[in-house]
């Protein structure tokens, strides 16, 4: 029975790596005339390789591809960390948010980092070293981009990396890495809170300061005033610490304060209702990078 189970598992991984049998979908969007427009796309779940010691780790990822052959510019969306065991966290899809990029001609990939969902390895975290945590998470973004570079429909010269909550910290840590084709990064309510560390807020500010000194790309930061994780004035402190150290393209960083959003502005990206709040400024950021952001019909 064990040999049969291993065989079935191997076959499943081969299928995932080959990206066979994609799931087709469609979404209702509004065109310029206010009418519903139907958009087709493909959703695929893959297990992508990450080099690790002593052996390779496979990361679960969701890939959304617009209809057509491409090549399509790429958006990477990095997930946050839900309470509880990371291995029990569900696969991130952010379907409503992903569709906004799909309908503008972007492929979207959402990797589950090491130890999350069906990704292999153990979750890297738990210590009070927030800066190191972010850098270790950023390795998974590199592995994701390396995998997407093998897909013929992806334009690897036009990449934007986005992250929410813990994924925002991951994204800003990744911004210290010079990866060809990455043009900018967006941080939605990014950070990491460890209440077992009495000085976690100072460590978080220091982590962003360190990232700022090494960052390589323009960035847009999106935070609110009633964030259950990052109370005011912490978002401003994190941003200012980053910007004070940033040079070159990274000095082109901007903080968008969305004010109060519902009961918790930490959800401004993950909640469907938040899309109209941030989408116009995200569009402006894309255009500032020389990227298109007009919705197709």
Label the model's feature ranges.
Residues 31-69:
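N-terminal cap/lid segment of alpha/beta-hydrolase-fold proteins
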Residues 71-80:
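Short beta-strand element of the alpha/beta-hydrolase
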Residues 82-94, 100, 110-136:
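Cap/lid segment of the alpha/beta-hydrolase catalytic domain
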Residues 129-152:
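Alpha/beta-hydrolase active-site loop
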Residues 154-164:
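Alpha/beta-hydrolase fold nucleophile elbow
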Residues 168-179:
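Short glycine-enriched nucleophile-adjacent loop
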Residues 184, 190-247:
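The feature captures the conserved acid-bearing segment of alpha/beta-hydrolase catalytic domains
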Residues 247-297:
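C-terminal catalytic histidine-bearing segment of alpha/beta-hydrolase fold enzymes
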């Amino acid at each position: 029975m064990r040999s049969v189970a291993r065989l079935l598992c191997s076959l499943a991984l081969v299928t995932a790596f080959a990206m066979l049998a994609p799931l087709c979908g469609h979404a209702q969007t509004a065109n310029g005339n206010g009418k519903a427009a139907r958009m087709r796309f493909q959703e695929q779940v893959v297990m992508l390789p990450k080099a690790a010691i002593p052996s390779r780790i496979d990361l679960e990822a969701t890939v959304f591809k617009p209809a057509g052959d491409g090549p399509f510019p790429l958006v990477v969306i990095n997930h946050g960390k839900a309470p509880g065991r990371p291995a029990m966290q569900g696969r991130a899809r952010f379907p409503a948010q992903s569709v906004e990029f799909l309908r503008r001609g972007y492929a979207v990939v959402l990797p589950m980092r090491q130890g999350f969902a069906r990704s292999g390895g153990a979750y890297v975290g738990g210590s009070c070293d927030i800066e190191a945590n972010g850098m270790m998470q950023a390795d998974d973004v590199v592995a994701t981009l390396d995998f997407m570079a093998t897909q013929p429909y992806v334009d690897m010269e036009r990449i934007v990396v986005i992250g929410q909550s813990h994924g925002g910290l991951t994204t800003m840590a990744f911004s210290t890495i010079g990866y060809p084709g990455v043009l900018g990064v967006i941080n939605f309510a990014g950070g990491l809170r460890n209440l077992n560390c009495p000085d976690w807020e100072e460590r978080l500010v220091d982590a962003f300061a360190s990232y700022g000194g090494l960052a390589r790309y323009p960035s847009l930061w999106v935070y609110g005033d009633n964030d259950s994780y990052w109370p005011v004035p912490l978002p401003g402190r994190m941003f200012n610490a980053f910007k004070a150290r940033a040079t070159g393209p990274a000095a082109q960083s901007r903080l968008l304060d969305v004010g109060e959003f519902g009961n918790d502005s930490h959800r401004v990206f993950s909640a469907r209702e938040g899309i109209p709040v941030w989408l116009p400024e995200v569009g402006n950021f894309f255009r500032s990078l020389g990227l298109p952001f007009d919705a197709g019909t």
